[in-house]
């Protein structure tokens, strides 16, 4: 419930531009955000493992 209200509040114009927080496009999580993909680490891993993000492969060395 608290996450939904934070997401709704994030849609309104902010008083200060510094307080803008990046959020995951899928789940709304604010921590572990990957800017290049617009996703949190959990959603990124899920989509990468299922092959939905083109060009992303598991690292092996």
From Swiss-Prot:
Cofactor note: Binds 1 zinc ion per subunit.
Gene Ontology terms: biological process: translation
Pfam families: Ribosomal_S14 (PF00253)
Gene Ontology MF term list: rRNA binding; structural constituent of ribosome; zinc ion binding
Key word rRNA-binding present: yes
Residues that coordinate or bind Zn(2+): 24, 27, 40, 43
Cofactor(s) for this UniProt protein: Zn(2+)
Membership in a protein family: Belongs to the universal ribosomal protein uS14 family. Zinc-binding uS14 subfamily.
The protein's name in its UniProt record: Small ribosomal subunit protein uS14
Source organism phylogeny: Bacteria, Pseudomonadati, Nitrospirota, Thermodesulfovibrionia, Thermodesulfovibrionales
């Amino acid at each position: 419930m608290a996450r939904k209200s934070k997401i709704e509040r994030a849609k309104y114009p902010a008083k200060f531009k510094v307080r803008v927080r990046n959020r995951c496009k899928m789940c709304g999580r604010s921590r572990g955000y990957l800017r290049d993909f617009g996703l949190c680490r959990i959603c990124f891993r899920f989509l990468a493992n299922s092959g939905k993000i083109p060009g992303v492969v598991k690292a092996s060395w």
